[in-house]
């Protein structure tokens, strides 16, 4: 099993539990002496404006690491993995993204994409009956 999968599963479970336990307000936390900003509940300002997020998508945990040029977020959807994958395969190219690869199974999928400013990877995984979660990472070029 690839090392990414257990980490992804842990992050998704923590994000879903945190979203369920938290209130409706967005929170951010930055560590003293560090530029890393952790948040939840709102799209990080460093996510490209052109990146599509469906209206029913819910933002969970987020991370901004300016020193490494990385932004990460967890999204949950009231849909199964194939529906989420279909949405992104249809909506990334018209917004200027090139899909480098898109491969997986009925319950987990990985999409690698890029535009002129970022390289991105999205790992989508079924989180339960009719629910999917996606870990999305953007790396500045």
Name each model feature, range by range.
Residues 2-9, 14-17, 22-141:
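An acidic-aromatic pocket/loop used at catalytic or ligand-binding sites
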